[in-house]
Amino acid sequence: MGIKKLTDLIEDNAPTSIKTNILKNYFGRIIAIDASTSLYQFLIAMNADVSSALTNQLGETTSHLQGMFYRTIKLISRGIKPIYVFDGSAPVLKSGELAKRQARRKEAKENLKEATEVGTNEEVQKFAKRVITVTRKQNEDCIKLLTLMGVPIVKAPCEAEAQCAEIVKKGKAWATGSEDMDSLTLGSTVLLRRLFFSEAKKMPILEFELQSVLEGLGLTQDEFIDLSILLGCDYCDSIKGIGPKRAIELIQKHKSLEEVIKHLDKSKYPLPEFFPYPEVRELFKNPNVIPADQLPPFQWKDPDVEGLNKFLVEEMGFSDVRVAQGIEKLKKFKNTSVQSRMDSFITVIKKPEDPNDKKKKVTKTPSKPSAKTSKKSSSTFKRK
């Protein structure tokens, strides 16, 4: 689930709220990861060439396990502590969007079949990406894998990104790792995108800080939620003719969707037949999640060596040598990832002011200004 054109809107109106970073700089951070979007990325990355898709001896796809195993090891080797959150049932309001996706996937399957017979390799890859979906078994496989690796998982009652946001808002994790921008709409204080992008692509991680986004856009969180609905989300259709620029102008001026609709020229901007924005707003403000304080303490345990070998090597046909190497890396870096960042426990204590200091006169010799001027470096994301 995402918000249409929200990244572009933030980039244009609040560019300083987007920073670029690299994986190693998140050492010691606890990150709540939307497992579903991660799995989708793994499947796309490894199945783009359908002829080389990874499978076991039974012909079952194993790309999701390959991606999850090695990318998780990479996170842990950088000192990051991941928590994977899996989707539960989709909200009823999302059924319309799911039906649209199913129709698009059916059409893509037909196009893929035709492209495989007479099309170019580029066409095959394009349609192959569109037919990929994450199955229940693939989710269960990954839950089993992560448990054997000693990595904590959470099964959300509904949307994974909403559960991630709850965990972050309550201070149980530092950021949400997801490609879906609605993580910000749901209140995650920090969002990391491109967390699982291959470092070979040389694409930096994008870091969004919610408070900076709100300040840059000049909105409250409630107004930001209404803006997200107006831009378009998975829960309801958007108003045709209203793009990102017009949407933020309307919310900044009228402050709420009720007032926007009240002053809108309906002949020019007719409302969609199905536009339950009050219910959608409620889903963003009070999503169906497990309260963070009711979740068990997150623990990163030692890997189950015997269990990993049985599952990955015997059942899934992985290389025993590579699995052994992966397990050794898990053991090696587990203690590293348990260490905390210095800034997580250092508190600056201000020295009490001595009233006698005010009576002392200190004469300073003015220093000459330096001939050199320092240039400010910026890590904000700029669109090329």
UniProtKB/Swiss-Prot annotation:
Q: Where is this region: Disordered?
A: 349-384
The answer to keyword DNA damage applying to this record is yes
**Modification after translation (UniProt):** Phosphorylated. Phosphorylation upon DNA damage induces relocalization to the nuclear plasma.
Q: Where does DNA bind?
A: 71, 159, 232, 234
- InterPro entries, from UniProt? 5-3_exonuclease_C_sf, Flap_endonuc, HhH2, PIN-like_dom_sf, XPG-I_dom, XPG/Rad2, XPG_CS, XPG_DNA_repair_N
Please list where the region (Interaction with PCNA) is annotated: 338-346
Q: Recorded GO terms, molecular function? A: 5'-3' exonuclease activity; 5'-flap endonuclease activity; DNA binding; exonuclease activity; flap endonuclease activity; magnesium ion binding; manganese ion binding
**Where, in this chain's numbering, is Mg(2+) 2 bound?**
180, 182, 234
Xref: Pfam families:
XPG_I (PF00867), XPG_N (PF00752)
Q: Which UniProt keywords apply?
A: DNA damage, DNA repair, DNA replication, Endonuclease, Exonuclease, Hydrolase, Magnesium, Metal-binding, Mitochondrion, Nuclease, Nucleus, Phosphoprotein
Compartment(s) of residence = Nucleus, Nucleolus; Nucleus, Nucleoplasm; Mitochondrion
- GO CC annotations on file: mitochondrion; nucleolus; nucleoplasm; nucleus
Q: Does the keyword Mitochondrion apply?
A: yes
Region of interest (I-domain), ranges? 123-254
Highest taxon above the source species: Eukaryota
Q: How is the cofactor bound?
A: Binds 2 magnesium ions per subunit. They probably participate in the reaction catalyzed by the enzyme. May bind an additional third magnesium ion after substrate binding.
Report biased composition (Low complexity) as residue ranges: 364-384
Please state the protein's primary subcellular location: nucleus
Q: Where does Mg(2+) 1 bind?
A: 34, 87, 159, 161
Which co-factor is required?
Answer: Mg(2+)
Purpose: Structure-specific nuclease with 5'-flap endonuclease and 5'-3' exonuclease activities involved in DNA replication and repair. During DNA replication, cleaves the 5'-overhanging flap structure that is generated by displacement synthesis when DNA polymerase encounters the 5'-end of a downstream Okazaki fragment. It enters the flap from the 5'-end and then tracks to cleave the flap base, leaving a nick for ligation. Also involved in the long patch base excision repair (LP-BER) pathway, by cleaving within the apurinic/apyrimidinic (AP) site-terminated flap.
* Oligomeric and partner information: Interacts with PCNA. Three molecules of repg bind to one PCNA trimer with each molecule binding to one PCNA monomer. PCNA stimulates the nuclease activity without altering cleavage specificity.
* PANTHER family in the record: FLAP ENDONUCLEASE 1 (PTHR11081:SF9), FLAP ENDONUCLEASE FAMILY MEMBER (PTHR11081)
Assigned protein family: Belongs to the XPG/RAD2 endonuclease family. FEN1 subfamily.
Protein name, as recorded: Flap endonuclease 1
Q: What is the lineage of its organism?
A: Eukaryota, Amoebozoa, Evosea, Eumycetozoa, Dictyostelia
| Gene name in the database record | repG
